[in-house]
């Protein structure tokens, strides 16, 4: 990591091509190949307003009983991931806690945590509008990066590896994944728990 590089906020993200001044940082000085594959995930949020009816549909689908019995239906990453996450939440006693979920397009993880009586804060670049009492949604840059609160647990699945790539409208930053991990660490209580996963 080059501490001397100044990373401007690229407001036109996502980019179809890596800007020349960031190319060496993204490719580790040419060691990593570049593939021409453009994705625009700024509108990937399945629903922009999370009202009680919408959240209730997830609470019902992702109930503890449904996940344990394999009846949660089609899940974003399949039954095994849902069951592994739920098992982690139960084994590490993530119940009645203050929990953040970093990165989401639909509240499937939030539903599991809400079913375990947690207060949940979703952290997103593209922030949904929550109308549910024990589910807040906050902006990564305006809230989480400068947050003074700490969480008992933070959960993230298939999110951190995208940080800094600009796909979701976030600024380009070759060290985005490292920086968000530092931000997560700074938002955890001293004995807090991070549950991290990637497909």
Task: Report the location of each language-model feature.
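A short acidic, Gly/Pro-enriched loop at the edge of an enzyme's catalytic core
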Residues: 143-158
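Surface-exposed cleft-lining segments at the edges of enzyme active sites
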Residues: 66-73, 162-175
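N-terminal accessory regions of S-adenosyl-L-methionine
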Residues: 1-95
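Residues that mark the start of a beta-strand
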Residues: 97-98, 150
């Amino acid at each position: 990591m080059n501490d001397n590089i100044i990373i401007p906020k690229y407001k036109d993200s996502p980019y179809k091509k890596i800007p020349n001044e960031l190319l060496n940082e993204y490719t580790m000085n040419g060691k990593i190949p570049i593939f021409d594959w453009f994705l625009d995930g700024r509108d990937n949020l399945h629903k922009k307003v999370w009202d009680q009816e919408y959240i209730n549909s997830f609470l019902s689908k992702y109930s503890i009983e449904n996940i344990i019995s394999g009846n949660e239906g089609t899940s974003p990453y399949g039954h095994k991931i849902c069951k592994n996450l739920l098992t982690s939440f139960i084994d590490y006693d993530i119940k009645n806690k203050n929990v953040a979920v970093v990165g989401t397009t639909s509240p499937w993880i939030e539903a599991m945590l809400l079913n375990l009586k947690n207060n949940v804060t979703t952290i997103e670049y593209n922030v949904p509008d929550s109308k549910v009492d024990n589910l807040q949604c906050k902006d990564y840059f305006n809230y989480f990066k400068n947050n003074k609160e700490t969480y008992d647990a933070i959960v993230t699945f298939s999110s951190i590896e995208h940080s800094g790539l600009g796909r979701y409208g976030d600024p380009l930053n070759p060290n985005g994944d490292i920086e968000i991990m530092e931000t997560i660490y700074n938002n955890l209580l001293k004995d807090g728990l991070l549950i991290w996963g990637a497909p």
